Amino acid sequence: MENKLDKLNLGSGNEIKEGFINVDFKQDKGVDIVHDLNKHPWPFENNSFKEVVAENVIEHLDNFIQAMEEIYRVTKPNASIKMSVPYWNSSFAYIDPTHKRGFHEHTFSFFDPESPYCKQRSYYSKARFKVKSFSFVIAPFAPYFLLPFVKNIEIKNFILKKIIGLLGNMFSNIILELRVELQRV
């Protein structure tokens, strides 16, 4: 039997996840805890969660590093953290006026102790996560991706990620979203 008390869905909005504690800044159907994630500390004990999901929420927060430190604080060692965030040069990063930032595929490497980014700038944060995987979400035929018959495509293949990543860094709106899975160290 799964324990709902050790899985956290941050910024749930109307995307309520069964078996998770659903947190949002506004009361809505299925929201278990109302809390503004910009207010620290979050209302959870240290080392409480084995899994955290943050789909399209981190980009709304005022302080990204502080949010990562809170995720680190509330997760158990080896916890799984799954995030979806807008890609740095996607229009999705800045169309929504409540978005504070976009993200690059190496952004989360600053928290990975095996990464040269983390090794060079270990003073940025004490939070440590291993980057388990990442993928790109692209939508063919932009700007037609809002049409109901045009589906997003998630790129997980290593070689395709290299190619799409190169193109996505040269041209805007090729990569819409970054999905990353982290493991708390």
Pin down the residues of each PLM region.
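Polar low-complexity intrinsically disordered regions
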Residues: 1-4, 131
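Conserved SAM-binding loop
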Residues: 3-89
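S-adenosyl-L-methionine-dependent methyltransferase catalytic module, highlighting the catalytic core
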Residues: 65-66, 76, 80-185
